[in-house]
UniProtKB/Swiss-Prot annotation:
The gene is tuf. This is Elongation factor Tu. GTP binds at residues 19-26, 83-87, 138-141. NCBIfam families: EF-Tu, PRK00049.1, PRK12735.1, PRK12736.1, small_GTP. Keywords: Cytoplasm, Elongation factor, GTP-binding, Hydrolase, Magnesium, Metal-binding, Nucleotide-binding, Protein biosynthesis. Transmembrane segments: none annotated. Residues 83-86 are annotated as: G3. One of its GO terms (molecular function) is translation elongation factor activity. It comes from Bifidobacterium longum (strain NCC 2705). Residues 138-141 are annotated as: G4. Residues 19-26 are annotated as: G1.
Length: 399
């Protein structure tokens, strides 16, 4: 049976849920899809809550590890929704997930208020350039004291303000559990709160202006083999557009390879073309599963080149922001997280700079052990032992 065609009728927006583990991100994601399925059944499939927590060991631990993508529509827009992991060891995925957001719903339990990971996620959202955050104050059904809810709300607004987000953003009081379960007390009230949340998302998160006129580039997040058809790479198109049967290059990590895209899919529907902002799978002609890997990019031939040496401007996180406790010196070898992968690099501080302290804004040279598809202005995170210790941008390519 031929797959359905993807219809591009409404503006497309990428959003996601971020926040502390156990504050109800995945439950809220399920509640949103259920409420929208009931309101607009023609355009919204029914998702199973257990589908979102996609790996079996997560279900056992009750935590979301892989980033789960679902799609849904409001009256105004088509959304792709990533349910981001809440656990500190999965911050790396958070970076790949959050980088794909045009806006985020910060989920905070009214019973707890902002916790360590709430702060870390807001900080990461700022680092990776999420433009807008609004708040779902969850578990309001478990707090009788309205004043307590208002105190938590004030605390969340302060946290957003401290990290450069709008403190006057919409804050919706909700209960994801109450909206998800038909027999929950005040079910209708909580269903309405989820509708209010999505109205706020429609109005508050701006429709992104995607870079359609720039040369095509898609960072590879995952690689699959489809038997009898070939190798598929998936990711979110960063810029430009691409039609079926167009030649492309695979750039970074290894020597640059030429291939042709023979099929394009999104959410299991085939497309004639994809464009900036689409979550897409590309079928590559003549390449095997082991010829491509996460961290490479698919790009218009000649538009981007691989480099190993650059000068960067970096903000080094303080201890309180989850960064290092001590300074670093020349020859420090952390990982540099570009788009979808970590590459080890050696730092060389400029002459006259002996060390860089947590909290510093620094400029230094980096030499990577593998080439990355790189341009001036490209952002990266500096990571060490699984923790983000800095964020920066490439100011000058040296080699």
């Amino acid at each position: 049976m031929a797959k359905e065609k993807y219809e591009r009728t409404k503006p497309h927006v990428n959003i996601g849920t971020i926040g502390h583990v156990d504050h109800g991100k995945t439950t809220l994601t399920a509640a949103i899809s259920k409420v929208l399925h009931e309101e607009f059944p023609d355009v919204n499939p029914e998702y199973d809550f257990n589908q979102i927590d996609s790996a079996p060991e997560e279900a056992a631990r009750g935590i979301t590890i892989n980033i789960a993508h679902i799609e849904y529509q409001t009256e105004k827009r088509h959304y792709a929704h990533v349910d981001c992991p809440g656990h500190a060891d999965f911050v790396k995925n958070m970076i790949t997930g959050a980088a794909q957001m045009d806006g985020a719903i910060l989920v905070v339990a009214a019973t707890d208020g902002p916790m360590a990971q709430t702060r870390e996620h807001v900080l990461l959202a700022r680092q990776v350039g999420v433009p807008k955050i609004l708040v779902a104050l969850n578990k309001c059904d478990m707090v009788d004291d309205e004043e307590l809810i208002e105190l938590v709300e004030e605390e969340v607004r302060d946290l957003l303000d401290e990290n450069g987000f709008d403190r006057d953003c919409p804050v919706i009081h909700t209960s994801a559990y109450g909206a998800l379960h038909d027999d929950a007390p005040d079910h209708e009230k909580w269903v309405q709160s989820v509708k209010d949340l999505m109205d706020a998302v429609d109005d508050y998160i701006p429709t992104p202006v995607h870079d359609l006129d720039k040369p095509f580039l898609m960072p590879i997040e995952d690689v699959f083999t489809i038997s009898g058809r070939g190798t598929v790479v998936t990711g979110r198109v960063e810029r430009g557009q691409l039609a079926v049967n167009t030649p492309v290059e695979i750039v970074g990590i290894r020597p640059t390879q030429q291939t042709t895209v023979t099929s394009i899919e999104t959410f299991h529907k085939t497309m004639d073309a994809c464009e900036a902002g689409d979550n897409t799978g590309l079928l590559l002609r003549g390449l095997g599963r082991d010829d491509v890997e996460r961290g490479q990019v698919v790009a218009k031939p000649g538009s981007v080149t691989p480099h190993t040496k650059f000068e960067g401007e970096v903000y080094v996180l303080t201890k309180d922001e989850g960064g290092r406790h001590s300074p670093f010196f020349s020859n420090y070898r952390p990982q540099f997280y570009f788009r979808t992968t970590d590459v080890t690099g050696v730092i060389e501080l400029p002459e006259g700079v002996e060390m860089v302290q947590p909290g510093d804004h620094a400029t230094f040279t980096v030499e990577l052990i593998q080439p990355i598809a790189m341009e001036e202005g490209l952002t990266f995170a500096v990571r060490e032992g699984g923790h983000t210790v800095g964020s920066g941008r490439v100011t000058k390519i040296l080699a």
